[in-house]
């Protein structure tokens, strides 16, 4: 694509002595694989530009699976993620790299991604609400349509006090059994509205998105989750000392 378009780098790795292989998420073309020739050389004006969470304008060309980056400019400084928000950002980057096919347009998802990164950069509390909203948006764009407001069995609106079990591709059915795969009507309404007023609804949202994303991710664990697990004990120890 010869024209300029907005983009973010999801991941990069060395490619030859002076170049980079990039996995980028673009507004118009979706996920694209690019070679940035000379980007690692000392004199490259791309040094420090092709970083995750930096809003970019870029141009590329080529007809194969791997395109060639022609030029790139940072629209602004990288969004300031650190600590837990940095690991959260790495998680959604890896999520996109795992579930999106190359060169499939997801313009609305691009802005959901931007909104999530901005929310992470601006939060002073837990990143969990922003992550759950993004996961739900991603599932919607992947065609994973779920009716959170009505019981799939009776067709009636869900009741806050009742329990429902999710059946893949069918929806939520009333259930007398309560376990890790069931949700209350209150949980389902929170998922529909994407508002999580307390720890209980946040945990329920995390259970659902993990369940729903599993078929897309397969059996291979996410590296960012492992990094996050390693980070959390250190963070807990530091908080106790403080």
UniProtKB/Swiss-Prot annotation:
This is DNA repair protein RecO. One of its GO terms (biological process) is DNA recombination. The keyword Cytoplasm does not apply. Gene3D superfamilies: Nucleic acid-binding proteins, Recombination protein O, C-terminal domain. Pfam families: RecO_C, RecO_N. Keywords: DNA damage, DNA recombination, DNA repair. The gene is recO. It comes from Salmonella dublin (strain CT_02021853). Belongs to the RecO family. InterPro entries: ARFGAP/RecO, DNA_rep/recomb_RecO_N, NA-bd_OB-fold, RecO, RecO_C. GO terms for cellular component: bacterial nucleoid. Involved in DNA repair and RecF pathway recombination. Monomer.
């Amino acid at each position: 694509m010869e024209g300029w378009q907005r983009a973010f780098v999801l991941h990069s790795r060395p490619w030859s002595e002076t170049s980079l292989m990039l996995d980028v998420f673009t507004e118009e073309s979706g996920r694209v694989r690019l070679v940035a020739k000379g980007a690692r050389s000392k004199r490259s004006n791309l040094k420090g530009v092709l970083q995750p969470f930096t809003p970019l304008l870029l141009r590329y060309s080529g007809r194969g699976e791997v395109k060639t980056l022609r030029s790139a400019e940072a629209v602004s400084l990288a969004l300031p993620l650190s600590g837990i928000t940095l690991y959260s950002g790495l998680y959604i980057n890896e999520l996109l790299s795992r579930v999106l096919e190359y060169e499939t347009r997801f313009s609305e998802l691009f802005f959901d991604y931007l909104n999530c990164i901005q929310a992470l950069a601006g939060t002073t509390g837990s990143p969990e609400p922003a992550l759950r909203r993004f996961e739900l948006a991603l599932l919607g764009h992947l065609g994973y349509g779920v009716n959170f407001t009505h019981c799939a069995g009776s067709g009636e609106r869900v009741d806050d006090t009742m329990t429902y079990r999710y059946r893949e591709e069918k929806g939520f059915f009333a259930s007398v059994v309560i376990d890790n795969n069931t949700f209350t009507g209150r949980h389902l309404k929170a998922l529909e509205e994407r508002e999580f007023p307390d720890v209980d609804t946040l945990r329920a949202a995390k259970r659902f998105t993990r369940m729903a994303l599993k078929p897309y991710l397969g059996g291979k664990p996410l590296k960012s989750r492992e990094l996050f697990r390693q980070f959390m004990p250190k963070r807990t120890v530091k908080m106790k000392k403080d």
